[in-house]
């Protein structure tokens, strides 16, 4: 016996693979099982029963030319009915071994090969059919993709997010009709995900409305774990799509195995139809065995001929049906564009218009899935939709960022407003809009922000920062923010990415923009019109502009502070500055300036000027600052200024002068005539001495001389009795004057990094100077008298 279980490895496949088997493959599979049973049954009979039984022929030698067994054929019987002889039996004088020998010899020589090997051929051909059908499920290059696809498909089908997404869309589509019914509640079927309700369910709702209303819909429940699983599914689908759409090995393999089955079908059909008649019940056998048996002619009976002929015709019938399925498969493969798959019907049904069409092997597998159940493709499409993914991300964000967690991040910013700062999130949590106490919202590196209508709940919002965070603002929210928002900071790689709605916030007081102009637009430096910003007082622009944007003049009547940071790009045209009549503060930082622009001298209301980090070498134009009668703060730091001209004495109103990080070696004596000066910073230069005239600065409160080459200080310096901060660190001082006792207001003194051997005892007379305000080496401090140290350490 041949156990059928031995053939399981050819027929058994993973149950999950059934989703990739269309009806013709299923039919072909059953046909192969039937053909295999025919072959196994025939082989079993062939092995367990006698194959052939032979008897010697007693014909005369005169009739030796006639075929043996002729008299046993049906036509012989009909012709010789009248001439039958009555026989009482013949003795052959053969023993059992001779009969067995003759049977085997005639089986091998006289019986046609088709009759001998028919059942084996059936088994072999059927196994080849099975291998061809399941080869792409076993071949490593295709099976890995199929297994991965089926794994993802099953998870997508069973995911609670699929049901929720389809149900939400269904609810939106039926929202209108349902809203008009006061007594009928629509129930969404979770199992199918289609959002349709059967007639029986509708009747139940009509009969028991109270019961339906009290039960919350299951589709609205999605816990955090399920949300994370759905998020992982989206990533898997994306990577799988990119991987599978690259080639068409699955499509090609399926075509090849189908073509091979068709060719084999024709070959089997032809030779079976030709040789099936070779299966006969009586077989004439002529062998030269007269010396052994005494006979050379035998008449043999093929015992299974009758059964084999019936099995052969049955097998041919199954093969014909099998071949028809293969031909239909070829028609289906070449008649339809199987390398392209459109989700058009799914988009129309679900309303998810962003579901993309797919191609190559991905499309082919989806076509096969549709032959099994189109619901699989519909539910799988949910994970191809970016809208669906964004909804899921939003839901996960809301789970992760609860209102209590967001409140823990609230803190006061530099402007004193209660600020919520969020950085590098996949989206903006809806729970943000539940914090009505938020006054400032800072969003950094958050992709594709879309402000919902819930923005109107932030009634105290006055400041908004968008740092590399593109944001869409609906019209209703624009109206809400138009008169409410006071400060907005926007930062992008390029300024053209700045949302246009920013320039329509008419209540805005401060606008901070950061981003580069494209190289072809940098020279023109065109900025959106600022005419709508009627309340704008502060404008900050960090870019690579070649000139001051012309739109700055749109706010010339009320702009009070302008800051231009050019990141080293040279600012060539500044004529637009002349129109800023009420400008109080001007910053031109890293603008590549080599001279002080003349346009600045036209700003009569200017109070503060910052020219930090430019290429200024000479400041002879400083004389023209006398036209800026209100100028009180001048910052010329981080340049290459080698000297200060004597005209500095003309700046009578100047209160703060910053000249640090330059190349100064001396200071003019005329600097002492700036009697209103309160702060002077000349640190990080190359000063070797100070003019005694600095003692005339009776209003001076802060003097920074650190990181120079000073070897001594003029005694006149200690006439500045209002001096509170004196920074002398990292110079070449060898001694410190005892006249420091005259500085009664001194509260901070830096002497670290000099060549001092001792500190004067008079430091104890500086009533405002404490140990915390004295920056000096520990050894020098310990060298002070104990009573001086005790006095300085008193609270």
UniProtKB/Swiss-Prot annotation:
Could you state a single Gene Ontology molecular function term? volume-sensitive anion channel activity
Superkingdom of this protein's organism: Eukaryota
* Gene Ontology process terms (BP): aspartate transmembrane transport; cell volume homeostasis; cellular response to osmotic stress; cyclic-GMP-AMP transmembrane import across plasma membrane; intracellular signal transduction; monoatomic anion transmembrane transport
Q: How does it sit in the membrane?
A: Multi-pass membrane protein
Q: Which residues form a coiled coil?
A: none
One GO cellular component assignment for this chain's record is: plasma membrane
**Glycosylated position list:** 63, 301
What's the short name of a Pfam family annotated to this entry?
Answer: Pannexin_like
Q: Residues on the Extracellular side?
A: 44-116, 286-312
Query: Which InterPro entries does the UniProt entry name for this protein?
Result: Leu-rich_rpt, Leu-rich_rpt_typical-subtyp, LRR_dom_sf, LRR_domain-containing, LRRC8_Pannexin-like
- Chain positions of LRR repeats: 535-556, 558-578, 582-603, 605-626, 630-651, 653-674, 676-697, 699-720, 722-743, 745-766
Q: Give residue spans on the Cytoplasmic membrane side.
A: 1-22, 138-264, 334-795
Disulfide linkage: 54-300
Q: Where in the cell is it found?
A: Cell membrane; Endoplasmic reticulum membrane; Lysosome membrane
Instruction: Tell me where the transmembrane regions lie.
Output: 23-43, 117-137, 265-285, 313-333
Identify the keywords attached in UniProt to this record, alphabetized.
Cell membrane, Disulfide bond, Endoplasmic reticulum, Glycoprotein, Ion channel, Ion transport, Leucine-rich repeat, Lysosome, Membrane, Repeat, Transmembrane, Transmembrane helix, Transport
Reaction(s) catalysed (UniProt annotation): chloride(in) = chloride(out); iodide(out) = iodide(in); taurine(out) = taurine(in); 2',3'-cGAMP(out) = 2',3'-cGAMP(in)
The main location class comes to: membrane
Query: How is the quaternary structure described?
Result: Heterohexamer; oligomerizes with other LRRC8 proteins (LRRC8A, LRRC8C, LRRC8D and/or LRRC8B) to form a heterohexamer. Detected in a channel complex that contains LRRC8A, LRRC8C and LRRC8E. In vivo, the subunit composition may depend primarily on expression levels, and heterooligomeric channels containing various proportions of the different LRRC8 proteins may coexist.
Membership in a protein family: Belongs to the LRRC8 family.
What does the UniProt entry state concerning the protein's domains? The volume-regulated anion channel (VRAC) channel forms a trimer of dimers, with symmetry mismatch between the pore-forming domain and the cytosolic LRR repeats, a topology similar to gap junction proteins.
Q: What does this protein do?
A: Non-essential component of the volume-regulated anion channel (VRAC, also named VSOAC channel), an anion channel required to maintain a constant cell volume in response to extracellular or intracellular osmotic changes. The VRAC channel conducts iodide better than chloride and can also conduct organic osmolytes like taurine. Mediates efflux of amino acids, such as aspartate, in response to osmotic stress. The VRAC channel also mediates transport of immunoreactive cyclic dinucleotide GMP-AMP (2'-3'-cGAMP), an immune messenger produced in response to DNA virus in the cytosol.
Write down what this protein is called.
Volume-regulated anion channel subunit LRRC8E
- Please spell out the taxonomic lineage of the organism that makes this protein: Eukaryota, Metazoa, Chordata, Craniata, Vertebrata
Q: Which gene encodes it?
A: Lrrc8e
